[in-house]
Every structure is written in structure tokens, then in C-alpha cells.
């Protein structure tokens, strides 16, 4: 935490508005507490937070609204099928925003483009993105991209 106490004010000086933590073993009490301390410190420094990996949302973002979203979901980086995805709004999403990792054009997907387009709307996250493993250059000719832009 000592490094973050020095780093977070520096990030603000540089104009950075948020950080994404990742690859922390959140399952233990020790690391969950460490992560919550990080969110508090980010709030003190007016930084937004996005938690990566298997963190389980517990309502902490109600106290610290700078915690905009957290993964804690089997998103497209795991290439789930449509059956998995249609259960998420009724299971994982009841615990708050989810950083799902939409992979709109990835050829390994087991769903359609229409499914991905709908998922980006149904799966709530203030930091929604549409190209995780994709390249932005793939998107310039697709008419539905106007919907994402607006």
C-alpha cells in the first residue's frame, strides 16, 4: 500500500483519472482487505477504480462510488456460449456493474454479432468497451458501430 500512497497522487498530477487492479488473489481475507484499502485510497485521490479478475462484488461500490465496475464474471475472454450469457443478468448482474469484456469481432466467439451487440446493452457497466481482443481498425466499416459511438 505504501507504493500506492506515493503513486496515486502522481497519477492525478499526470491527469490519469482511474486505475484497474488485476491479478490479485482476492479470495483470501488478507487480499480482499488490501483491495478495499486500495479502493479507499483511490477515492481519497479522486481516482476511479475497475477491479479485474474474480473479485466478488459485495456492495462496496455503494460506499465507494469511485469503484465503477468489477469483473467477477466469466466474460468473452473465456468464450462462453449464449446459454451462459443469458443467465448473467439474473445471477451475477444483481450484484452490480460487471466488466464483461465484449469481444465483438473475435472469431473464437460462440455467439452472434447480434448477441454481442445486445450484451453490451444488457450487461451494465459504466466502463463498457467493445474491443477487448479485437482491433479498433476492424470496426470502421460496420454500420452498427454508429450505435456504440452514440
Task: Show which residues each predicted segment covers.
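Aromatic- and carboxylate-enriched substrate-binding clefts and catalytic-loop regions
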Residues: 1-112
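Glycan-recognition and catalytic regions of carbohydrate-active enzymes
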Residues: 134-150
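Charge-patterned, long linear interaction tracts outside catalytic cores
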Residues: 100-139
Amino acid at each position: 500500500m505504501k507504493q500506492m500512497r506515493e503513486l496515486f497522487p502522481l497519477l492525478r498530477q499526470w491527469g490519469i483519472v482511474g486505475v484497474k487492479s488485476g491479478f490479485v488473489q482476492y479470495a483470501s481475507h488478507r487480499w480482499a482487505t488490501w483491495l478495499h484499502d486500495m479502493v479507499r485510497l483511490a477515492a481519497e485521490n479522486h481516482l476511479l477504480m475497475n477491479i479485474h479478475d474474480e473479485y466478488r462484488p459485495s456492495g462496496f461500490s455503494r460506499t465507494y462510488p469511485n469503484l465503477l465496475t468489477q469483473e467477477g464474471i466469466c466474460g468473452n475472454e473465456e468464450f462462453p456460449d449464449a446459454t451462459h450469457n443469458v443467465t448473467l443478468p439474473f445471477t451475477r448482474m444483481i450484484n452490480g456493474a460487471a466488466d464483461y469484456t465484449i469481444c465483438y469481432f473475435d472469431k473464437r466467439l460462440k455467439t452472434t454479432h447480434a448477441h454481442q451487440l445486445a450484451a453490451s446493452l444488457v450487461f451494465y457497466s459504466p466502463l463498457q468497451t467493445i474491443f477487448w481482443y479485437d482491433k479498433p481498425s476492424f470496426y470502421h466499416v460496420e454500420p452498427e458501430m454508429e450505435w456504440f459511438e452514440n
